[in-house]
Amino acid sequence: MTNAQPKFSKPSKMPCRSWSLEALTTCPASKDSNGDLVPACHGCYATGGQYRYPNVKNLRLHNQDDWKHDDWVDAMVTELDNDRYFRWFDSGDMYDIRLATKILEVMRRTPWTRHWLPTRMHKFAKFKPVIALMELLPNVVVRLSSDGVLGEVIEGQTTSTIIPTISHKRPDMLACEAYERNGKCGTCRACWDKDVKVVAYVAHGQKMLKQVKNLIQTVEVV
């Protein structure tokens, strides 16, 4: 198939564009061994709010078919010609190894663009070699997303986690400052910085705050 036409979102928080897919349906790593959503995905922002609007949803559904075109990599490289920063997946994940391989090629062919890719697909063995190749590229930061919302991290990896409040930040974490900037990144580019090993996002949004509250109460009872 040819004639790929990738479509991009521009999250209000972000200083750049993003390429996204439908949340959860393209997130096989969002569930634990029992088939239940992990805490971080249970409170996912991309399943509510403006992400439910038809025009936003249709963009993600379009991309879910569009990446399968033979010329998708070429189309993405052309689109990123003027992008100095780019985020993959403000919604969804690289659920298919063929997609992951194509994303790697886009990254290789756009050395002028700094790519940030959050993912949970490291849980599956077949994705690990592709992720390792991405991590070798100087213009790419792959952040392995923690499943927890109480500050749990994936030790020894470039990662991100969710914390209940700023007081839960550990010394080895860099807290996302968007909560101090009306939800905006501002001039911060920590998520694209290989030297920043752990980014901690303060829980926000009704769904996530409820999830955090329930887990804290459970821990206190135990």
Predicted regions located by residue number:
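Class I S-adenosyl-L-methionine
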Residues: 1-222
